[in-house]
Amino acid sequence: MVKNVAVVSLSAGVLGESFAKHELDIGAKRLADYGLNVRFMPHALAGIEHIKNHPEDRAADLLAAFRDPEIDMILCAIGGDDTYRLAPYLFEYGELETAVSGTDKIFLGFSDTTVNHMMLHKVGVKTFYGQSFLSDVCELGGEMLPYTRRYFEELIQTGTIRAVTPSDTWYEARTDFSPKQAGVPLPAHPDTGFELLQGSPRFSGKILGGCIDTLFDFFDGGRYA
């Protein structure tokens, strides 16, 4: 069971901005209500400009979280578009491989965090492509979305996810994140479940998932050329 959670900003530094303070407070309280101890790593709240200009600090936070024996879960604050810049500080001297040696910590996040998942996959760490702190735990609508909450609770209580089934609801994206949106639910619509595009409805094998835009960048290489 998870007890201690480290929040890291490996992509964008939005979480450290004053305009996101009300969301941070909501998320921190929700985690505390689960009985979790939340630790924001030293640079997690450094803000957009610092995080943008100092990928070495982002990498240092990730390494410190893995090295800390008290941390059970590493939760990414939010995605972004440049976490690839951490690579030299994680791989040049084998820093990441050394830091994760023997670890069974949960690593959780999505979007640009796909890159971090692949980095950790490279050094043999199993990760969970799922909730981020700001986007999901800090949801303004009064509570975490039910589908999100269901799997988050399973993960912190059991350390794993046994099976993923479709949500019966989809939600329109929130466009206003100001304090006045606190308690305002997202417009919801019925969902029809998985859609089979081709092939057999039953198949087995290993799969690497993630953000399709980020995965495309791995092969295209043109975005930051």
Language model features with spans:
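Conserved anion/nucleotide-ligand pocket segment
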Residues: K126-D213
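ATP/NTP phosphate-donor binding region
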Residues: M1-E70
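General beta-strand structural signal in soluble alpha/beta enzymes
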Residues: R39-P42, L75-C76, F107-F110, T127-G130, ...
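Long, hydrophobic/aromatic-enriched structural stretches that serve as scaffold segments
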Residues: E70-F91
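Oxyanion-binding "anion nests"
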Residues: I207-A225
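Short, acidic/small-residue loops that bind anionic groups at enzyme active sites
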Residues: L90-K122, K126-L134
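Gly/Ser/Thr-rich loops at beta-strand to alpha-helix junctions
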Residues: S11-L15, I78-T83, L108-G109, T113-V115
